[in-house]
Amino acid sequence: LPAMATNGYWSYGYGPKSKSIAGACVAMSFGAMCAASNPASLVRVGNRIEAGASLFAPTRGFTANDDAQTPPYASIPPGEYKSANDLFLLPHFASNYMLDEQSSIGVAIGANGGMNTEYDSAVFARFSPPGVPEYQASAPVGVDLKQMFVGISYSRLLSEEHSIGITPILAVQSISVTGLEPFRMFSKYPDSVTNNGTDVSVGGGVRFGWLWRVNQQLKLGASYQTRLWMQKFDSYKGLFAEAGDFDIPPNFDLGFSYRFTPEWTFAFDYQRIQYSEVNAVGNPADLVFIPGSTLLGTDDGLGFGWNDQNVYKFGVQWQYSDDLTLRAGYSY
């Protein structure tokens, strides 16, 4: 039973086998869901169908201290704030079909999500200017972002040692934002900041993979996913930088696996997620809100302030018997 976490808003792995070794599977070949990490592995897993789901129970909240400056400076009322909605279902499905001894085609479906927030009180009530109804903060306050990916993979053996793979990816994402009315006054598009229901965008990109079986013990792997170019969130173009642009950032993985004995295998992956490539995520989050300024919805507008993320994944697998495999992993 894996302990669940995320790398930013990315899942650290897709499918139970991947999650159980903290996602360190770019150089592993143990299932069709490995296509989410490295499509080059599929030609080595044979015909198979996999389906399942994970229950994700993150704890989300924050504490507002009582040392904020007094008005006219806005502040959040001091206290403990805990988000509602503690349990999320993340399904997955994957299949692989061998076209011949040298090639295969597969389908994989995965998702990111489960880190939404929903606070029951009007958290930003003190940010509202008096006497302006359209800027009065409401409750609940929160953001709900969901992403789903469908990949169709082709994998081919170039030799006994080398295989490659390519996965065109269809991505669908949705977002809903509530309770941010006071921030309309700082937006280029004040009617497209908050409380506009659920907006959906569709887009896609490509993942490439390579796997090298150096010998019976050592395998090396690498994969690269392009930026996923998405339609803009038009309903929230006044909130996100570049008028609602929320592309999914590119990332790459490098890794190896080493089979010490027929029973024991160790795996390591290095992943880099390039959040700074997407302005809505990478733009600074520490801009000063001055009356009359326009900080939201512009190309240089407020972002999450996230840097590119380096992720290190370690996994170990023990094939105890033909019927039992034990795995453990750590992602940092």
Where are these regions (language model features)?
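Outer-membrane beta-barrel porins/channels
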Residues: 4-19, 69-73, 87-332
